[in-house]
Amino acid sequence: SRCVIDGLPETHATREFAQRHHGRVFMNFFNEHQRGSLNWDRKAMIVQGNRTEGLDTSRAAIRDRKVVLPRRSALIEMFAKHMAADAKVLDEDADTGTKKYRYIRTGENHFSLAFTYAWLAASNRRRVGTWGR
């Protein structure tokens, strides 16, 4: 199995954790300029991907019922609230007219990012969607 953790803000602590579990733990750093496949660097214990694509993929997993959630409970309600706290918006560059989607945080999103990292780790094994290829 593989674990993906946020590389920020405590890079030193996350790097130590990844080193203790070398080959199984990867620090994630989102790269807004990256498109397509994730970049897994086994030596540096880093995975990079586009944040918007990653959040899109984790939401598709829920929407497409690739993940079975437990029965409705207070914890599942909190999970849903955190998932909804990352809202997708369309930005348009005033100068060029170029349009691009991105996610903005509207509230607590800890479960949203944790689920995205878990799906990212699982996608590397299963090659789920384009983001995991």
State what each model feature region is.
Residues 1-95:
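Mg2+-dependent endonuclease catalytic cores in nucleic-acid-processing enzymes, primarily RNase H-like
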